[in-house]
Curated annotation (Swiss-Prot):
Organism field: Xanthomonas campestris pv. malvacearum
Catalytic activity: Eliminative cleavage of (1->4)-alpha-D-galacturonan to give oligosaccharides with 4-deoxy-alpha-D-galact-4-enuronosyl groups at their non-reducing ends
InterPro entries xrefs: Pec_lyase (IPR002022), Pectin_lyas_fold (IPR012334), Pectin_lyase_fold/virulence (IPR011050), PEL (IPR045032)
Role according to the record: Plays a role in bacterial invasion of plants.
Similarity field: Belongs to the polysaccharide lyase 1 family.
Region (Disordered): 185-206
Pathway where it operates: Glycan metabolism; pectin degradation; 2-dehydro-3-deoxy-D-gluconate from pectin: step 2/5
Protein name stated in the entry: Pectate lyase
Position of the signal peptide: 1-26
GO biological process: pectin catabolic process
């Protein structure tokens, strides 16, 4: 018999329909995506229709893994996370392969994963989404720390250390909604790792990547904090066969705080970025700002009323950095309190097919600081 960690009382099945509707409207675990690209292609519903028997409350790594692997009906599952879960269960990872075998958490189709406490957090683990129709809400993800970084002498002019595993990877999946999720290096910031071969020894990879034909993704009211290479949308210039016409992603009302680069870095995708707040400095000792939007091969970025408070930056070339792209459109954004002016060809060739509500740029910072991230749902 498959374990169930939390089910609704049997009597609840017999309450009046009006009460059921009232409860459903008030329960964030039952909500579906209402903004951005995740509303397209039939919408993103996750486990919003899960049977009571397929609703789990988990407090440990073992319970979380069991809930993710459980056999459920066609309406999917809801997994409610309570408190801080250490996926390593107190046993440090010794190698990259050891980390992969114990830390990876695959999220199946029609799943809603939601934190139900203000401190709901995943540590020493990472999520992988290769299945369609997934919702992740109201949790903190401490970016994974690879114990075995690899030196690449050909990475950059002086070589670099590289590591594996992102906090969340969306690979080939369609219809994914990430809402009120905080990504952070947390307890292991990059200044703690020392140097080798004359370069900082980097134990982190990305925070969140969307790649290999993934599509119809919305990131809303989330927070990315204290990280170097943040969000990659499209993983390779040579992936046109899988990525062209896909990688449709919306990021809105989201905080990027002390992020060095890739906020996001885009290839191929029609990516809509609106009402986001970026704050940082080129002189930050741990996470110096390099660029925000990486304009890569065949990318089609629409940036709209974003706010960039970045000390040390005075022009668009550091906001929209050229990584082989040819078009980029910005409308109404602010850089350090002044209108952002870019010289890019703005003919991106598409407009958002969904309706959305825009804040004026002067209201973005206050809105995002008050509402974005885990614990603010």
């Amino acid at each position: 018999m498959k374990p169930k960690f939390s089910t609704a009382a049997a009597a609840s099945l017999f309450v009046g329909s009006l009460l059921v509707v009232g409860v459903a409207c008030a329960d964030p675990a039952l909500e579906v995506a209402t903004t951005g690209w995740a509303t397209q292609n039939g919408g993103t519903k996750g486990g919003s229709k899960a049977a009571a028997a397929n609703i789990y409350t988990v407090k440990t790594a073992a319970e979380l893994k069991s809930a993710l692997k459980a056999s459920v009906g066609s309406n999917g599952r809801i997994i409610k996370i309570s408190g801080i879960i250490d996926v390593s269960e107190g046993k440090p990872y010794t190698t990259t392969s050891d980390m992969k075998s114990r830390a990876r958490l695959d999220i199946p189709t029609k799943t809603t994963l939601i934190g139900i406490t203000s401190n709901a957090e995943i540590r020493e683990g990472y999520f992988y989404v290769k299945a369609n129709d997934v919702i992740i809400r109201n949790i903190t993800i401490e970016n994974p720390w690879d114990p075995e970084p690899v030196w690449d002498p050909d990475d950059g002019s002086a070589g670099n250390w590289n590591s594996e595993y992102d906090g969340l990877t969306v690979e080939g999946a369609t219809n994914v909604w990430v809402d009120h999720v905080t990504f952070t290096d947390g307890r292991r910031t990059d200044d703690q790792n020392g140097t080798a071969n004359g370069r900082p020894k980097q134990h982190h990879d990305g925070a969140m990547d969307v790649k290999k034909g993934a599509n119809f993704v919305t990131i809303s009211y989330s927070a990315f904090k204290s990280h170097e290479k943040n969000d990659l949308i499209g993983s390779s210039d040579s992936a046109s066969s899988t990525d062209s016409g896909k990688l449709k992603v919306t990021i809105h009302n989201t905080l990027f705080e002390n992020i060095s680069a890739r906020a996001p870095r885009v290839r191929f995708g029609q990516v809509h970025l609106y009402n986001n707040y970026h704050v940082g400095s080129t002189s930050n000792k741990v996470y110096p700002f390099s660029h925000a939007h990486g304009v890569g091969k065949e990318s089609k970025i629409f940036s709209e009323r974003n706010v960039f408070d970045i000390s040390g930056v005075s022009s668009c070339d550091k906001i929209a950095a050229d990584y082989g792209g040819s078009v980029y459109r910005d409308q109404g954004s602010l850089l350090n309190g002044k209108a952002l002016t870019c010289s890019w060809n703005s003919n991106i060739g598409w407009t958002p097919p969904y309706t959305y509500s825009l804040l004026s740029a002067d209201k973005v910072a206050a809105d995002v600081k008050a509402k974005a991230g885990a614990g603010k749902l």
